């Protein structure tokens, strides 16, 4: 049913509010970030009936989007995308559900109709193309997606990881919605969790936000959206070394991790830093295992992790209990598995700290605009005061367990270290 009047809307809402459903948003322009596009249609399948709510389409009598809050489960292809358009609870991301078990991204390549392909190719410059693609063709495509989702729900519903589905996707959606201001206007990032290690990639519109070059000046265009604002970056110090230390119960003394390591190697700070990361991500020589108690414990941990992986056919993360299955990984060895585990530890610790941070900063004017592996970027409104920055720093550091360095600047290229201001 295409819902075009109040009578049809009442029937739909009565049915929708009493059942679980699949919801698929159809934006006006699929080439734009969801924050820059608007809804054209909303496809809803209650497993018994299907409905299409026309919000902005040339063929229909359009309606205002109703309140769709429900206590029932709502399944969708992409929870993060749906939350850009609708404020809903109990939304289950079927793509994530399936990925948690199979390690594979759902195949979406053959879901377009010939009308979608033809019109997108012929009118590739036209904005809001979905508003002129026939509604019946949108329904045809949505039926294919809905069938695929139902098949995956039947197979993998027991593998829903609530922490990933709710907590992590909500955190990333929060950052995405804030956007980043540039000298050319606001741009938006898009995090992708479908990576072998679980560490999100982050790119949209030709920009790889997870790998912005620090040296070529490409960061210079990122500025504050506020007249009295600056960008502030908080960067974890020796993050991976400290994460693993926590895992293996090794306590670093106060101060610099690399100066501590230099004492074992008999080298200067920079060389100690280079060697520690070389050993952490690669081969640990026998003499280092003998002289360095940290890497002795790391070596034992790697061997233990490898044995668990071989015996159980999976390893499980500490924080969110995500399983990485042997059958989904290729050409694995002990060190490669350890590297995957480090990245998963990093990601999940970051998500845990975001879950603590976001409720505390939501009401401030300043915006959290980027998270990248071991750093967090804030668009800081001076009116929020240094107390705001101190609050963020304290939450990130988790009782001083993971010290952060702080820098700020009028743009993301020219950043000045101000860590000493917070000592």
Where are these regions (language model features)?
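C-terminal polymerase-core module
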Residues: 283-288, 298-343, 379, 383-423
């Amino acid at each position: 049913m295409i819902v075009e009047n109040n009578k049809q809307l009442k029937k739909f809402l009565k049915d929708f509010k009493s059942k679980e459903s699949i919801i698929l948003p159809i934006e006006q322009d699929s080439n734009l970030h969801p924050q820059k596009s608007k809804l054209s249609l909303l496809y809803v399948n209650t497993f018994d009936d299907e409905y299409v709510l026309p919000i902005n389409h040339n063929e229909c009598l359009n309606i205002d989007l109703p309140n769709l809050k429900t206590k029932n489960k709502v399944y969708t292809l992409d929870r993060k995308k749906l939350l850009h358009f609708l404020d809903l609870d109990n939304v289950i991301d079927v793509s994530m559900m399936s990925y948690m078990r199979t390690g594979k991204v759902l195949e979406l390549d053959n879901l377009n109709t010939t009308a979608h392909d033809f019109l997108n190719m012929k009118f590739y410059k036209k904005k809001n193309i979905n508003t002129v693609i026939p509604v019946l063709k949108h329904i045809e495509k949505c039926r294919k997606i809905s069938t695929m989702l139902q098949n995956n729900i039947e197979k993998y519903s027991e593998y829903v990881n609530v922490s990933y589905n709710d907590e992590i996707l909500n955190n990333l959606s929060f950052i995405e919605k804030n956007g980043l201001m540039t000298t050319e206007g606001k741009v938006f990032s898009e995090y992708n969790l479908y990576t072998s290690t679980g560490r999100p990639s982050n790119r949209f519109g030709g920009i790889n936000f997870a790998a912005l070059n620090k040296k070529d000046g490409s960061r210079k265009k990122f500025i504050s959206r506020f007249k009295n604002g600056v960008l502030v970056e908080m960067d974890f110090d020796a993050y991976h070394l400290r994460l693993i230390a926590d895992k293996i119960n090794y306590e670093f003394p106060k101060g610099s991790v690399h100066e501590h390591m230099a004492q074992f190697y008999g080298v200067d700070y920079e060389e100690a830093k280079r060697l520690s990361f070389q050993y952490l991500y690669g081969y640990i020589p026998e003499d280092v295992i003998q002289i360095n108690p940290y890497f002795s414990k790391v070596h034992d941990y790697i061997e233990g992790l490898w044995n668990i992986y071989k015996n159980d056919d999976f390893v499980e993360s500490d924080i969110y209990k995500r399983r990485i299955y042997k059958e989904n990984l290729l050409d694995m060895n002990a060190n490669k598995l350890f590297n995957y585990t480090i990245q998963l530890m990093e990601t999940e610790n970051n998500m845990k700290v975001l879950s603590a941070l976001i409720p505390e900063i939501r009401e401030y004017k300043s915006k959290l605009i980027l998270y990248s592996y071991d750093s967090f970027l804030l668009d800081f409104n001076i009116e929020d005061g240094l107390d705001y920055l101190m609050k963020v720093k304290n939450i990130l550091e988790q009782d001083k367990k993971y010290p952060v360095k702080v820098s700020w600047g009028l743009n993301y290229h020219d950043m000045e270290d101000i860590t000493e201001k917070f000592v």
